[in-house]
């Protein structure tokens, strides 16, 4: 791997352009020379290798004679998914734990391994599950990944997903936000040795989660090591087979329309379960959150945006006051339709009037609004969807700052 780095540096010193195509050629040539698997020399492994040498073997790194300008060019070559932070802001998405939902929309999936409306196979959800839905662990994992991909992480937008935020107890809301800030303030970036995805080609995310538990102690930030041990001691599973088996019976009943999502979630995650034990310490005071927010003002990774998810009927002055104190700057709001007939037959249990009021209140409190809109709902027609969407984007009572359209 060192030879590839040296070849890149040589090309850059000669003024050559090393784009992805040129980099692939360098990797393939070195793989043939060494008789190695190309995957072992993949681009995603090069930057962590460079970072590790610079940090742990300064004499070796000094021999490469890399000045600041050359390093800047090298990092541009090695950076993974460069568009991800093209705006200068790195986005970190985290997921809250499964919890009863105040809604019962017809179109929402009922995956008992996830908060309502989410599916465990989605990338962010899979990462959250492997990190026990813990905000500190999720932020640490994403900070580590972004760092190892070569992205700047001085400005962070946190996106908190998981259904209706206000459905969670206030103590949990405060704890969750406090831990997000704490992870950023602690600079909770793990070492390369704690990333099994870099150590073995083709490894699954589930297997990576298991191997992470065996990572060297000095490769993990202290709070990460302590927190993972705490969940393990409580009996919280991260193994794919255990996770699937743990909800199988309840999932079968929910899929058969027996009992419902909320009842099943209470049985799986409520008092008397491992998650019930964990819930007892997942709480914090507003003073602790404000302390972490104050520290973050001068931290290495500063929060410049914080997003939560809610429903129009949960948008009240009291809820918005709390959300503002928690540090939020933007609200993701599930609108789905402005056709009252469609809202009713899809069991949204909200009115167009409530949607208008939610928009008005959110603007009054200074929040940006990221709206969700759905096409092809039960009872919808293409013509009706078009009229509905045009109204949503042109009528003054609505006109969100951002919109996500679901098919």
Q: Can you say where each PLM-predicted feature lies in the sequence?
A:
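Active-site-proximal loop/turn and secondary-structure-junction residues that shape catalytic pockets
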Residues: 162-166, 310-314, 337-339, 373-379, ...
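Flexible, acidic/Gly-rich N-terminal and inter-domain linker regions that tether
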Residues: 1-138, 142-281
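Conserved, mostly hydrophobic/aromatic
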Residues: 105, 160, 308, 323, ...
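Active-site mouth loops of central-metabolism enzymes
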Residues: 96, 303-315, 378-383
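Conserved C-terminal portion of the radical SAM core fold
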Residues: 326-330, 353-407
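Aromatic/hydrophobic pocket-lining residues that form the small-molecule binding cavity
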Residues: 139, 173, 316, 355, ...
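Active-site-adjacent "gating/activation" loops or surface patches in catalytic cores
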Residues: 313, 318-344
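Alpha-helix-loop-beta-strand connector modules within alpha/beta enzyme cores
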Residues: 180, 184-185, 231, 285-300, ...
């Amino acid at each position: 791997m060192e030879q590839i780095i040296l070849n890149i540096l040589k090309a850059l010193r000669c003024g050559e352009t090393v784009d992805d195509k040129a980099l692939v050629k360098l990797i393939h040539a070195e793989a043939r020379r060494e008789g190695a698997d190309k995957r072992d020399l993949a681009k995603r492994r090069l930057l962590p290798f460079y970072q590790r040498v610079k940090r742990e073997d300064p004499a070796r790194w000094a021999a490469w004679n890399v000045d600041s300008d050359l390093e800047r060019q090298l990092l541009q070559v090695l950076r993974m998914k460069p568009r991800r932070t093209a705006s200068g802001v790195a986005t970190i998405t985290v997921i809250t734990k499964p919890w009863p939902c105040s809604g019962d929309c017809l179109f929402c999936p009922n995956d008992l391994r996830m908060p309502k409306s989410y599916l465990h196979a989605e990338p962010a959800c899979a990462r959250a599950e492997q990190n026990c839905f813990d905000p500190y662990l999720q932020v640490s994992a994403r900070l580590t990944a972004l760092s190892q991909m070569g992205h700047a992480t001085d400005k962070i937008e946190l996106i908190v997903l998981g259904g209706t935020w206000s459905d969670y107890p206030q103590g949990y809301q405060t704890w969750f936000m406090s831990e997000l800030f704490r992870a950023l303030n602690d600079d909770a970036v793990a070492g390369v040795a704690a990333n099994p995805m870099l150590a073995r080609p083709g490894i699954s995310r589930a297997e990576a989660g298991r191997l992470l538990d065996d990572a060297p102690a000095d490769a993990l930030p202290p709070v990460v090591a302590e927190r993972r041990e705490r969940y393990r001691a409580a009996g919280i599973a991260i193994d794919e087979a255990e996770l699937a088996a743990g909800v199988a019976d309840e999932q079968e009943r929910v899929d058969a329309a027996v009992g419902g999502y909320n009842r099943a979630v209470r049985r799986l995650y409520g008092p008397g379960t491992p998650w019930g034990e964990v819930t007892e310490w997942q709480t914090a005071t507003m003073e602790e959150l404000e302390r972490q927010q104050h520290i973050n003002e001068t931290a290495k990774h500063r929060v410049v945006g914080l997003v939560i998810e809610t429903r129009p009927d949960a948008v009240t002055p009291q809820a918005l006051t709390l959300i503002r104190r928690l540090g939020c700057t933007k609200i993701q709001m599930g609108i789905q339709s402005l056709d009252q007939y469609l809202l009713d037959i899809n069991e949204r249990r909200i009115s167009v009037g409530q949607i208008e009021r939610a928009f008005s209140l959110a603007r009054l409190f200074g929040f940006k609004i990221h709206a969700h809109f759905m096409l092809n709902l039960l009872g919808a027609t293409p013509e009706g969807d078009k009229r509905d969407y045009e109204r949503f984007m042109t009528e003054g009572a609505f006109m969100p700052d951002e919109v996500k359209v679901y098919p």
